[in-house]
Amino acid sequence: MTSMEARLGEATRTVPLPAPWDLNAYLAAVAAHRGRSISLRPVSAAMLAEDGCRGKGLWVARGHDDIIVYDADATDRNAEHIILHEVGHMLLGHGKDLAEPATPLSPKLAALLPSLAAQHVLGRNEFGVEGEQEAEVFADMTMVYATLPRRTARGFRLFRRDR
C-alpha cells in the first residue's frame, strides 16, 4: 500500500460516508470530528481567480470555523466534487498551522464576505502537487463510493487493496 493510499484510507475511516449519501450530513460529521463548523459560500469564478485560485474552490480557515468557497456556476455534481476536494485537504491535514499569519482575501472577495476574519485562505497554490493529488483522489473516490449501494456507513478502500 502506498503512502497516499494509507493517508486516504485513514481519512475516510475517521469520518465514514453516510448511507444513503448526503453531502450536508457528511459535512456535519466532518465538522463534528474536527470541532469546527463548515459553511459553504458560492461566489463567481472571477472572484476565485482573483484570489489566485486556479481551481474552482478555496478553503477559508477562520479561528473557530471553516468556509468552503466554490464556483457559483458549477453544476451540482461539480460543486459537490469541489467541496469534497476541500474537505479532503481538511481531513488529510493539509492546512497551515493556524498560528501562522493570515493570508489576506482579495478586495472583492473580502467585500463580498465582510464578516470573514480569515486565519488562512487555502487555495491550490498552498498545498503543492502531492497535496492537490491527494485531495483530488479523495474527492473522486468519495463521489464513487457515495453512489455505491451498501447497508451501513463506511469509509472507502482505495482500489480494494486492504481487504
Task: List each language-model region with its residue ranges.
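Short, well-structured alpha-helical patches and their helix-loop capping segments
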Residues: 75, 79, 83, 127-134
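Short, glycine/charged-enriched secondary-structure capping and boundary segments
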Residues: 83-84, 97
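Active-site scaffold of zinc-dependent metalloenzymes
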Residues: 39-80, 87-93
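Metalloprotease/metallohydrolase-associated module, dominated by Zn2+-dependent proteases
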Residues: 1-36, 96-163
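Generic detector of intrinsically disordered, low-complexity, polar/charged segments
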Residues: 32, 52-54, 85, 125
